[in-house]
Regions:
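Conserved small helical "lid"/interfacial subdomain of P-loop NTPases
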Residues: 3-23
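Active-site ExK catalytic segment of metal-dependent nucleases
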Residues: 231-242
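Active-site-adjacent loop/helix micro-motif of nuclease/hydrolase catalytic cores
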Residues: 240-251
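Short, hydrophobic beta-strand segments that form beta-sheet elements in well-ordered domains
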Residues: 265-274
Length: 297
């Protein structure tokens, strides 16, 4: 059972259907009601059913309670192997700092060495990560491997994600105010929240979510690939003209590289945002700009 999406918890109005975007509608125009402060709170609250509807302070405590339960109880219950809660906490903090990247075990080990008093060896890190996967705390995203016009080498490493962004904020001791004071960091956690929701929506459409990155550094945050071969390219941005322009450039560059003689062209290209007054389709290139507060499956 996955955490709830913003549509399931009632924060997204659901005016834009991800499934409908695969039909490439000519025009969309819907109002978004969520502000950046709302998004910061929802990242830290998470999609935990018991947190929905509670007063803000009590709702935020649910993620910390979950984090404590994972590190002190659940991590041992999964296979009966005793694991030190303090070690689990240190690893989860390192994982949180590298969420949304293709960080290797070696990278996580170096992070632990730089940020904590004692490092863990490779086998211990791998063992702990496997236990966290079994209790559905982390869920890495596989790489997408399309047919390209060029011989560009595609990175095949999985991308690191918790199943809910609030696990990462709890591990690092962050709250909504911390995110509002550091929008760059907030962008990484917002991406994780979007991935959480997209995974639920994709499963409802008989699809999966992938990540694309190649040797040149071209990267696409999410690719929704359906069983029938249709797919959509998605960039995640907090919002604002500059970031949206970056997203447009990325989506256009990747789309131009795809060899459409060997596979379908993307059914849609979308920039999923935290802010913005409306969901709409750009006339010049057909890219959809959709606030997360408007999206459903």
């Amino acid at each position: 059972m996955r955490p709830m999406t913003l549509f399931e918890s009632g924060e997204s109005n659901g005016k834009i259907s991800l499934g409908n975007l695969f039909t490439t509608p000519e025009k969309i125009l819907e109002k978004n009601e969520l502000k950046l402060q709302d998004i910061a709170f929802l990242i830290c609250r998470g999609g935990w059913p018991m947190a929905v509807g509670l007063p803000e302070e009590a709702a935020l405590e649910q993620a910390f309670d979950y984090y404590d339960a994972v590190t002190k109880e659940d991590i041992t219950k999964v296979d009966g192997v005793k694991r030190a809660s303090e070690r689990v906490q240190r690893l989860m903090r390192a994982y949180a700092r590298h969420q949304g990247t293709q960080a290797s075990v070696t990278t996580l080990k170096a992070d632990l060495k730089n940020n904590d008093t004692a490092a863990l060896d490779d086998d211990t890190i791998s063992s702990y990560l496997e236990a966290l996967r079994k209790i559905f705390v982390v869920e890495d995203m596989p790489a997408w491997n399309p047919n390209l016009r060029s011989k560009t080498a595609i990175r095949t490493a999985d991308t690191r994600y918790f199943v809910d962004p609030s696990i990462a904020t709890a591990a690092l001791g962050l709250g909504p105010a911390d995110l509002m004071n550091d929008l760059k960091t907030m962008g990484f956690f917002f991406e994780a929240m979007c991935v959480r929701d997209l995974r639920v929506f994709a499963e409802a459409l008989n699809g999966k979510v992938y990540h694309y990155r190649d040797k040149s550094g071209l990267e696409c945050d999410a690719v929704i690939h359906l069983r029938n071969g249709q797919y959509g390219l998605i960039e995640v941005k907090l919002g604002g003209e500059t970031l949206i322009k970056e997203g447009v450039e990325t989506l256009t560059a990747l789309s131009d590289q795809i060899d459409t003689t060997r596979m379908k062209a993307p059914a849609f290209k979308m920039i999923l945002t935290a802010t913005g007054e409306h969901a709409y389709r750009r006339l010049e290139d057909g890219i959809y700009i959709v606030p997360i507060g408007c999206l459903k499956q």
